[in-house]
Structures are given as structure tokens and as C-alpha cells.
A protein has these predicted regions:
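Acidic, metal/ion-coordinating pockets
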Residues: 7-372
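N-terminal hydrophobic targeting signals that begin at the initiator methionine
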Residues: 1-5
């Protein structure tokens, strides 16, 4: 009996200690505090709901959609001369070949613009009186979309190398390949996420005039262009220096509303200038250049202009990104495959010096003894 009483007493004492400990714990820490700690822990460990995730992704997409990138590359001669089939033989029908080292870059942007200096035609007996005339089969126009090129200007001195038939055949080949194009003193509009982008192409024998430029820009603005690009063919072959026409017309175009001036013809890189709120690319040099098997100046670049929304519906050029390249991926003989230079190399820095206007090398005497 005493043993039973001792056991009962021990049980009662133990229960009393437990109850007393609980009361003291509540008084010391409080139930509210314990609840808040629990709630916070739960909030930190909870996975975001699908609705929250969707909202965050939508917000990120809206932020990203406020920026667009347009890439500019230089002369693309995707053909061989009448005297040498080197380019055609190297490509051998592989449309991905010329831009294999840069296609990923050009396809990752929003739009890419190039200067096209060749004829696409399958016409039998089509010959040119010109020494520097380049022609490829019509299906070689497919190289452009395969490499990420979205638009080409044909406003240059090679437009009529094979006369009317060559010009017509080239236009048809580009249309079949799905590549928009414009010739001398012509305009083009395209839509980019609701914004109209206008392009004006002009050669006029290396001398775009104020009247031509103003008329074209006004026309594009009237058609709703919120961003205007002027593609001019001008300058002196082989020269790193600007002509008076380049300097004057570039500035005039900007003053009339051009946001980017894109130059070609010198076959070498010339400086980039920020004028007012616009970007002037005086010359982008050669890019994939089938016109020469061993060009002496192999420097080129991909220049990317970043567009952002400005006041109202207008877009503005907010940044410029430069990717220095070599027009060939091999030393010596041109393989026609432009490739980015490694950052920090002498070649990389040399491209930057040409584009920032500090390059001090002599002008080239253009030599076409190695016509492709």
C-alpha cells in the first residue's frame, strides 16, 4: 500500500512540475512571440505560388522589352569575281559557312543590317564590263538569313555591275530568300514590337545631298518612324580619314532627325562619333568579303546600337557595344568567315583605336591583285 502511495505521489509531483514549467514559459516568452516566430519561419520556407512566379516573369519581360539591339556589319560580298571562283568554291553550297563564327551573335539581337556588294544571278552569259564585279548563284542569297542578317542596303557602286538583268535578278533572289533590301535613294519601314523603324539608303555616286536626305527623313517621320537609320555609301577607299561630304552630310542627317548613320565604301573601319543624341558609323569596313583572297586590312567589327524608349513614342540610341572582329578566321588566305578577336589582344585594341579615331596608321593603297 505504501508503495502504491509513493508511486501516486511521484506521478502527481511530476505533473505539477510540467504544469509549472509551461506557465513560466508563457509568462517569459509570450504566446504572440512564439506565433510570430512560427509565421516568419513558414513564410521563408514557403515556395512562391505559380501566380507569383508568373507575375515576376511578366514584370521581367516588360522590363527587358524596353530595350532593343540593332547590329551593324560592313561590306558583304558573298560572291566571286569573274576571274576567280574562290568564294563560291569555299562555300560550296553551305549557306551557314560564311557567318558560322558570328551567327549566334547576330541572331541574338533584334535586327541586323549589312551592306551587300554583289550580284545574285543564274542567268547564262551574264558578264560585266567592270574589273571589280562579283557574282554568285541566286541561292547564295540564303547565306544572309542563315547568318542572321535581316536587311541589306544595295545602294552602292556595285548595284549595276551586271546591268539591269543583274540588278533585277539580285532583287528577286533577295525576295525569295526573305531578305528586305533597298537601293539608291530608297526607304524602308519595319515594325519592332510596335515601334516603326525607318531606313534610308543612299549612294548618289558617293555624294548624298542635303535635299535627298531631308526629303527621305521627313517622309519616314510622316509615316510614323520613331527611329531613323541612314545608310550612306561614301568616302574614299582605303582611307581612315573622313571626307568633307561624310562629315557634313552625317551631321546634317542627324540634325534632320537621323538616329544612326551607317556608312560604307572605304573598305576599312573609320571612327564612330556620338553627335547630339545620335550615333555615326562613318565606315564599317569589310565583313564577309569574297572580293579579295588576301586583304591587307583584316580588321572589322560588329557594332550594336541599343535602343530604349524616350519621350512619347520615340526611341533613342542609349548605348553602343563593339565586338572587334577579323574578316577571316584563318591567317594568310581569306576564308571569308569573320570571327571575333580575343579581348585584350593587339588586334582587338587596334580595332578599338580605329573606331575611336586614335589609329595612326597610314591609309591603304587599295590593291585588288588578289581579287576573289
Amino acid at each position: 500500500m505504501k508503495t502504491v502511495l509513493r508511486v501516486i505521489s511521484m506521478i502527481v509531483l511530476t505533473l505539477g512540475i510540467i504544469v509549472l514549467g509551461y506557465i513560466m514559459c508563457v509568462r517569459l516568452f509570450g504566446v504572440d512571440t512564439a506565433s510570430r516566430l512560427f509565421e516568419v519561419t513558414m513564410q521563408e520556407s514557403e515556395e512562391p505560388s505559380s501566380a507569383d512566379t508568373a507575375a515576376e516573369e511578366e514584370e521581367a519581360e516588360e522590363t527587358e522589352a524596353l530595350h532593343w539591339t540593332i547590329s551593324f556589319v560592313g561590306d558583304c560580298t558573298l560572291a566571286s569575281s569573274q576571274y576567280n571562283n574562290d568564294f563560291i568554291n569555299k562555300v560550296n553550297g553551305d549557306y551557314n559557312y560564311p557567318f558560322k563564327n558570328v551567327a549566334d551573335i547576330l541572331k541574338a539581337d533584334d535586327y541586323t543590317i549589312a551592306n551587300l556588294e554583289c550580284t545574285f544571278s543564274d542567268r547564262v552569259g551574264l558578264v560585266s564590263d567592270g574589273t571589280f564585279a562579283f557574282k554568285a548563284p541566286s541561292d547564295y542569297a540564303r547565306i544572309l538569313p542563315a547568318g542572321g542578317i535581316d536587311f541589306v542596303t544595295t545602294a552602292n557602286n556595285h548595284r549595276d555591275d551586271f546591268a539591269d538583268n543583274g540588278r533585277v535578278d539580285t532583287d528577286v533572289a533577295l525576295d525569295i530568300a526573305g531578305v528586305p533590301h533597298r537601293g539608291d535613294n530608297e526607304t524602308y519601314l519595319f515594325n519592332m514590337d510596335g515601334h516603326k523603324i525607318g531606313i534610308y539608303c543612299c549612294y548618289n555616286h558617293l555624294s548624298p545631298t542635303e535635299e535627298m536626305v531631308k526629303t527621305a527623313i521627313d517622309q519616314l517621320k510622316e509615316q510614323g518612324a520613331s527611329f531613323v537609320i541612314c545608310a550612306f555609301h561614301w568616302g574614299v577607299e582605303g582611307s581612315y580619314q573622313l571626307t568633307e561630304v561624310q562629315d557634313h552630310i552625317a551631321h546634317y542627317a542627324v540634325e534632320q532627325g537621323a538616329d544612326v548613320v551607317f556608312g560604307s565604301h572605304p573598305h576599312v573601319l573609320q571612327k564612330i562619333e556620338k553627335y547630339e543624341d545620335s550615333v555615326i558609323l562613318y565606315s564599317m569596313g569589310n565583313f564577309s568579303f569574297g572580293g579579295n583572297t588576301s586583304p591587307r586590312d583584316r580588321d572589322t567589327a560588329i557594332v550594336q546600337v541599343v535602343l530604349t524608349e524616350g519621350e512619347g513614342t520615340d526611341l533613342v540610341a542609349s548605348d553602343v557595344q563593339i565586338i572587334p572582329c577579323c574578316l577571316s578566321s584563318t591567317d594568310g588566305v581569306n576564308d571569308y568567315c569573320p570571327k571575333p578577336y580575343a579581348k585584350g589582344t593587339a588586334e582587338y585594341d587596334r580595332v578599338l583605336s580605329k573606331l575611336n579615331g586614335t589609329f595612326e596608321g597610314p591609309d591603304l593603297t587599295v590593291d585588288y591583285s588578289n581579287i576573289g
